[in-house]
Amino acid sequence: MTKQLLTQKYTNDVQQNSQKHFGYLTERMYSYRDKVLDKKPFIDAERAILVTEAYQKHQEKPNVLKRAYMLQNILEKMTIYIDDETMIVGNQASSDKDAPIFPEYTLEFVVNELDLFEKRDGDVFYITEETKEQIRNIAPFWENNNLRARAGVMLPEEVQVYMETGFFGMEGKMNSGDAHLAVNYQKLLEEGLIGFEKKARKAKADLDLTKPESIDKYHFYDSILITIEAVKTYAERFAILAKKQAKTANAKRRQELLDIASICEQVPYYPAKTFAEAVQSVWFIQCILQIESNGHSLSYGRFDQYMYPYVKADLEAGRETEDSIVERLTNLWIKTITINKVRSQAHTFSSAGSPLYQNVTIGGQTRHKEDAVNPLSFLVLKSVAQTHLPQPNLTVRYHANLDKSFMNEAIEVMKLGFGMPAFNNDEIIIPSFIKKGVSEEDAYDYSAIGCVETAVPGKWGYRCTGMSYINFPKVLLITMNNGIDPASGKRFAPSYGHFTQMTSYKELKEAWDKTLRYLTRMSVIVENAIDISLEREVPDILCSALTDNCIGRGKHLKEGGAVYDYISGLQVGIANLSDSLAALKKLVFEEKRLTTLEVWQALQSDYAGPRGEEIRQMLINEAPKYGNDDDYADSLVRECYDVYVEEIAKYPNTRYGRGPIGGIRYSGTSSISANVGQGRGTLATPDGRHAGTPLAEGCSPSHNMDKKGPTSVLKSVSKLPTDEIVGGVLLNQKVNPQTLAKEEDKQKLIALLRTFFNRLHGYHIQYNVVSRETLIDAQKHPEKHRDLIVRVAGYSAFFNVLSKATQDDIIARTEHAL
């Protein structure tokens, strides 16, 4: 039955054959997967009520203690449950896939959208009248009393215009925690929370309280001790519940529940001794971190590296078989999909599909520069293939000597058509990290975080990626309009001349440089103001305790407790910028086939009028395009992008000089689905794009402008300064499943990837292996495609939960042949 049901989600023989290769879920895990996916996501007010209780009771205490008591109150009182099918326990909300509310960050959008959650075009949530009433009851306490309110007043007057118009896309950052990191799971498994507790106690005892800085450290250490005890209590509650359920269970389930109880009495407080304990310990923390904070991209790190010793020992001792390990892994991945987050309607435009970006990284190299692939690496691939879910977000670290059979298996998973794994390239990422100040040993130990971002797990500060999303095409329009945003009519930058008065491309380029530098500075001001607010208002204690060197310094993450602290700025619409510049330079300034006035009027009318469409077709068809290995277009965007790389590096982050190595900014192109949201507010652009339509995502070419095949795309991307875009270079590609039908086709793709990574120094690539026809049919008949998963940007999502605008954007992507 399982085999029959699981193959129904595939529409072609290629994917069915790949599924046969990896095998199928066990009956219990298939049942569990089905149960979770069938569950409607509801808004859950329980956490919000418990947070309100704690904040009211501990109002006078320092924020680190208030946050510790908050988590304690939640973990001691929240609803817990153990599903019949699961071997792993721990829940984020009152029911699977329900979304808890985080009023200490914001409650404003929740209250405003109470009657709208079920009416959304995408990212729909359900809500009961009782929950609405509960939220309304606590709302007065949080009015002007949370992160969003305080961050809002922290913003200087000079940047208010960008917030009012949504230019920087800061909705997520003002409503959420930071996250974007992986804690030190290896140390957790080896030492248990008791090890962190001992360090905090010793550090507290060693303080000289006559030193002013020791007072804050004293309270920070106390908050860690309270938090660790709360986590211990949470695990013990599950041990008690498991024993209770065992009394009425059948013999087989009774023993399993008693085993669960024993495991929960051991971890995460004490070190893990077995694979089952290690998985449970990691899941407890992964889950609780997302109860403590609503920041996303809390990633598992290098799962196959820190977990393999337990797998190896259990296999050798006969405690586990490969099949039992795979089943427990599939259980973990299904638990991972139960975590949920509700975003404001505005935020969903840049994070479509309710993603949590919980990344698992496998492969790569060891700290000693050897191939890190081990037997667990293969089992992770197999388990992810069997579960066929958008979470976890699976990344393979590629390097020149990567095990060939492992690479083959990774491509087999990719053929299943759910957008995984993505590939990150050691050959460019490791040298880039070392260049920025990361030790060689740590650079070799990096993992993917969230989408395509990278960091050293357990040693990196919050938010290795930016959140301001500088809209490059809109910056160009502002540049052309003498510093005024043509959409809002508001001044965004100083006057550097109007496009209609320019007589050369050089003038336009000089104005671009000045405008981009100015707006980059403004984005830094916005991010700093919000970062300061995050530091003061919502310190995350558990997350800090599990990140080196927070206990050693006596500082939480936002104060500069981590070993490293780098963040990136993000950009949207790189390809639109390239194609626009190429069209303007060639058709206006070089060939003079169009005047500046004609182009400007066409843009302002969205290509309406007598010559509007004619001009649009000229811009589209008669100028070079990025993605075709054309130096004309590729060099223009490189020149303009270099300005951003140079400018963003000038500005340290708020942790600079406070302990961590780094404290600086660099570039990144991981724009997730912001290309759709940002496109909504961007007028027509000189590449022929209509107003309000999506921009190009990541560093991928504009849809259907890449005419010369995948190799040309890779060559164009490689001309970007990838060694400086350390925050991630997001490249999406799409191929028809039939393109990979034969073994020789798969080997062609592997050869293409090796060329991209070894010779062209590509940073990242990911594939949608799905046909346009399947996507169109899924849009028309969603009930037939419940399991259809697509790669949106640096993450995958169920196609049916996406808004129509995001679905259309994915359908429109170029479909390549090899």
Model-identified regions with their sequence ranges:
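Conserved catalytic cores of very large enzyme subunits
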Residues: 2-221, 252-259, 270-818
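Heptad-repeat amphipathic alpha-helical coiled-coil interaction surface used
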Residues: 204, 232, 239, 243-246, ...
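Extended non-globular scaffold/tether segments
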Residues: 222-236
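Structural signal for well-ordered, non-membrane alpha-helices
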Residues: 236-239, 243, 524, 645
